[in-house]
């Protein structure tokens, strides 16, 4: 193990020991905020610290076995020491790999709920229909993960599907999996309205935004313009006669969020504010990412909405994720929410990129 890594792990272990002592003190027990902070810090450290303790135990066992082999005369004891030495030496590389993976920088948003926005893009009616197909796909996937979906806002298309639809997904580590869905999803198929059977290419864009609290994204009321208007259903039909729909504009950034599907103006304002915080955060994150990529001269994709990430070819029952070069000939299953193969490949690719970035930083 790298000496610097070993030193850093020793520091982490000492910090966990100190936190454990602090959590026993009356001063901390009576301070709920501080206690929560310490527990959160401990939770972030404990997994890698436990693996480090396991690693040190293995190294000590190797040293003990070597000492026995150097001093022992009994044949049976020598044989046992050889077996123990072999087993522990074989265990070193795997546990070091686990520790190195645990030390990779974590996305602070991985545990968050998300807001997903799907928009029909290039392709007119067919793009809107495909946006509806993607919504169904994500709903079915959410069911397999025991996640809860709440619709936030939707503009239905007369031909079917949606020109725009937004929904919240709540559950365990939602962002860690769905964040890879951000980008342009291209579909190739024969539209139902196509009499000559020609294949049309259309696009729907997906944005996956981590839900941000008002503490994480502070927005001044003086920076907001709030407009109210009448909610309308598909085709522009008014569904109520009061100005219950809400549109909020963040004046400094120009970011806009609107909601009309809540039960009241108050509900719609809350929904719009939730979406606004997420969009402001995303805009700032994209700005920082662009600066980081420029500094690194890194040409890899960023998952931006304009980037084509996946192609769904219906005639050939084929789906290709262009970021990892993975093609699955089971589009029918993918559209039923079975997208785990893509997500696992993308998680692994993210880990690989983090390792490469860390190696570059260490050079």
From Swiss-Prot:
Membrane-crossing segments per the record: none
Task: Fetch the PROSITE patterns from UniProt.
Answer: RF_PROK_I
- N5-methylglutamine: which positions carry it? 237
Report the Pfam families cross-referenced here. Answer: PCRF, RF-1
Gene3D superfamilies in the record, alphabetically?
3.30.160.20, 3.30.70.1660, 6.10.140.1950
Q: How is it modified after translation?
A: Methylated by PrmC. Methylation increases the termination efficiency of RF1.
Question: According to its UniProt record, where is this protein located?
Answer: Cytoplasm
Q: Which SMART domains match?
A: PCRF
State any single GO MF term. Answer: translation release factor activity, codon specific
Coiled-coil positions: none
Which keywords does this Swiss-Prot/TrEMBL entry list?
Answer: Cytoplasm, Methylation, Protein biosynthesis
Cellular compartments per GO CC: cytoplasm
Sequence similarity: Belongs to the prokaryotic/mitochondrial release factor family.
Instruction: Specify the protein name.
Output: Peptide chain release factor 1
Its source organism is Mesoplasma florum (strain ATCC 33453 / NBRC 100688 / NCTC 11704 / L1) (Acholeplasma florum)
Q: What is the lineage of its organism?
A: Bacteria, Bacillati, Mycoplasmatota, Mollicutes, Entomoplasmatales
């Amino acid at each position: 193990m790298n000496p610097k890594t070993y030193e850093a792990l020793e520091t982490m272990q000492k910090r966990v020991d100190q936190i454990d002592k602090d959590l026993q003190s009356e001063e901390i027990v009576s301070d709920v905020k501080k206690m929560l902070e310490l527990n959160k810090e401990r939770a972030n450290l404990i997994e890698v610290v436990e693996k480090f303790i396991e690693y040190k135990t293995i190294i000590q066992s190797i040293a003990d076995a070597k000492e026995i082999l150097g001093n022992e005369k009994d044949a049976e004891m020598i044989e046992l020491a050889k077996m123990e030495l072999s087993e522990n030496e074989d265990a070193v590389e795997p546990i070091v790999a686990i520790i190195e993976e645990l030390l990779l920088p974590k996305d602070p948003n991985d545990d968050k709920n998300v807001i997903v926005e799907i928009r029909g893009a290039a392709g007119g009616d067919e793009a809107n229909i495909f946006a509806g197909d993607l919504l169904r796909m994500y709903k079915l996937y959410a069911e397999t993960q025991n996640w809860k979906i709440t619709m936030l806002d939707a503009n239905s298309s007369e031909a079917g599907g949606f020109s725009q639809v937004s929904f919240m997904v709540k559950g365990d580590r939602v962002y860690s999996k769905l964040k890879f869905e951000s980008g342009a999803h291209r579909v190739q198929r024969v539209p139902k309205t196509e009499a000559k059977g020609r294949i049309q290419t259309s696009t729907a864009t997906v944005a996956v935004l981590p839900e941000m609290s008002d503490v994480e994204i502070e927005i001044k009321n003086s920076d907001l313009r709030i407009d109210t208007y009448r909610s309308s259903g598909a085709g522009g039909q008014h569904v109520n006669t009061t100005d219950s729909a809400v549109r909020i504009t963040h004046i400094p950034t120009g970011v806009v969020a609107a909601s009309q599907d809540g039960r009241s103006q108050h509900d719609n304002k809350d929904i719009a504010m939730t979406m606004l915080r997420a969009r402001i955060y995303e805009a700032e994150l994209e700005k920082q990412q662009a600066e980081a990529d420029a500094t690194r001269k890194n040409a890899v994709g960023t998952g931006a909405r304009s980037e084509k990430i996946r192609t769904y070819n219906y005639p050939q029952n084929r789906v290709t994720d262009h970021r990892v070069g993975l093609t699955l000939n089971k589009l029918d299953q993918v559209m039923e929410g079975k997208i785990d193969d893509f997500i696992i490949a993308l998680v692994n690719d993210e880990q690989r990129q983090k390792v490469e970035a860390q190696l570059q930083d260490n050079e």
